[in-house]
Amino acid sequence: MKKYTILIPIYNDRESLTKLIENINEELNGLNAEVSILVINDASSQQIIDTYPNLENIHSFEIINMKQNRGHARCIASGLKYIYEKKKFDYVIPMDGD
């Protein structure tokens, strides 16, 4: 089974992130793959929801909170570094949170 990690940088867009997570979970129904989601919170001033119920098609969900706002590209770079050091995967899918 292939292992995918979806990398989502986010800044002050809680509603879009919630919809995106739910849509990803729905689209994965019946797919023979192990999919994890890693959200990089770019020091949002909004509270980012860190628990989503009923994510039966998503293997793991994790949020990394940046200490200060560093921008979209820096979030992706930080996320990729984390994934390469900490995760076992076959593919990484960077995806905007909005």
List PLM regions with ranges.
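Short, well-formed alpha-helical segments that are part of the catalytic scaffolds
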Residues: 13-28, 47
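A conserved acidic beta->alpha catalytic loop
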Residues: 41-49
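Residue-level signature of catalytic and energy-coupling elements of molecular machines
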Residues: 24, 79, 98
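Conserved donor nucleotide-binding strand/loop of the catalytic core
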Residues: 52-86
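A generic structural motif
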Residues: 31-35, 59
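Hydrophobic/aromatic residues located in beta-strands of well-ordered beta-sheets
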Residues: 37-39, 63, 92
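Short beta-strand-to-loop acidic/aromatic patch adjacent to the donor-nucleotide binding site
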Residues: 88-98
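Hydrophobic targeting segments
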Residues: 2-8, 17, 24, 35-40
